[in-house]
Amino acid sequence: MKAVTWHGKRDVRVDEVPDPTIQHSTDAIVRITSTAICGSDLHLYEVLGPYLTVGDILGHEPMGIVEEVGADVTHIKPGDRVVVPFNISCGHCGMCSDGLQSQCETTQVREQNKGAALFGYTSLYGSVPGGQAEYLRVPQAQYGPIAVSPEGPDERYLFLSDILPTAWQAVQYADVPDGGVLAVFGLGPVGQFAGRIGAHLGHRVIGIDPVLERRDMAARHGIETVDPTDIDDVPAALLELTGGYGAHGVIDAVGMEAHGGAGAAVAKFAQAATGMLPDAVAQKLIENVGVDRLTALHNAIGAVRRGGTVSISGVYGGTADPMPMMDLFDKQVQLRMGQCNVKKWISDILPLVDDPSDPLGVLDLTTHTVPIVEAPDAYRTFQQKSDGCIKVVLKP
C-alpha cells in the first residue's frame, strides 16, 4: 500500500509498504478514504525527528471503511464507515472510565512516561503506524472507532478524529460563563473550531491570528478578529476590547509553532539543533531545554481576566520553558490543558455534525484536498501557510 513516511527533517515521502494485518483479537483493519494533516504533524516535520525512525508512517486524523475485524470486535463490522480517534484507548481501564481516554492505562507508553499511545506520533507515543496510508491497523478497535452515517462527504465526519473534539475540550476547559468572552489565540484548524463552538454556545468570541485567510474564515462564522501584527501590545488590546477586564477564558491554540517572545532565541536554537545532533543528544536537548516559543501562551495569560481560565490545546514539547509564575499566581489564573479525550466528547458533538444545517461549519474548513501521492508538497504548503492553506485532506 501507499503510505506517507518520515525520512528526516522536512522530508516526508510516499512509499510502498506492506499492508497491515490483524495481530490481536481487538484489532480492525480500515481502508482509509480520507486522512488529514494535523498542525501537530508539523512538529514531526520540524522538531521531533529524534523520536522518529526512517520509514515511520505518519498521520492521526483518518476515517474509512472497515475491511476486517478481530474476534473481540463486535460494535463495528466490515463495510461500516468509521472515524478513528487519534489516541488509542481501551474503554475499560480506570482512566478511560473517568473520561481520560488520553491517559489510557492499557496503552500508556510507560517507558517514555507518556499517556495513551497515538497513531503515527513517534516513539514517545508508541511508534504505532499512522493513518496517512491506504490501510490502517486499529488496535483496541473493540472501543475506539466511531461508526458514522454512510451518507454525506467524508469532511462532515473526518474531524471527529482529532481537531473537532480537541476544540470542544478546549472550550469546555476555558470555562466561560453564559454570555461571557472567549479569546482564541491561533485560528488554525483547532482555533477555527474552538471559535465556532464558543459562538454556538453563546459566547462572544475574539480570535487572534496574523494570517488574513484565517481571520476571514473565522469572521464568516461570527468571530471578531484581531491582527496581532498591527498591535504593539496584544494583551492590552484585548483588555480594551473587554472593558478593561480581559476575557473570561482564553484558548492557546498555537503551541510550539509560535514565533518570538520569551525564550524564543533559546527555543529557535534548540529546534534547529535537534535536526543536526545525534538522536540521543537531541532527545536530551528536547527533554531539558525549552524548545517552545511561548508568545501565544504569555499573551493568553496577559489577556485573561483575574480569576479566569487559560485553556491550552496547542501542543508544547519542552520541559524547561519559562513561565510567568508571579502573574499566574497574582491573577488567580486557572490553567487546563492536555491531549483531547476524544471519546468523552463524541456524544456531545456527533449530533451537531449530523445536523444538515452544519452549525459548526465542518464543511467550511478544508482548503486543500489532494491525492495522497502529493503529500510531500501538501506538507510544505501547510507548513508555509502558502496558497491560503488552512487545512489539508489527503485522499488515498
State what each model feature region is.
Residues P18-T35, L48-S97, Q101-S102, P129, ...:
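Glycine-rich beta-strand-centered segment in the early N-terminal region that forms part
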Residues Q23-H24, K77, P177, Y245, ...:
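Residue-level recognition of short, solvent-exposed, well-ordered loop/turn junctions
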Residues R81-V82, E134-Y135, P145-D232, A236, ...:
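Mid-domain Rossmann-like dinucleotide-binding core that forms the NAD(H)/NADP(H) cofactor-binding site
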Residues H92-F185, L360:
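NAD(P)H dinucleotide-binding glycine-rich loop of Rossmann-like/cofactor-binding domains
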Residues A174, D216, E224-Q334:
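Glycine-rich cofactor phosphate-binding loops and adjacent beta1-alpha1 units
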Residues V211, Y316, N341:
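Residues in the short beta-alpha loop(s) of Rossmann-like NAD(P)-binding domains
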Residues H298, K343-P396:
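C-terminal hydrophobic helical "lid"/dimerization subdomain
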Residues R306-S313, M323-L363:
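Rossmann-fold dehydrogenase core element
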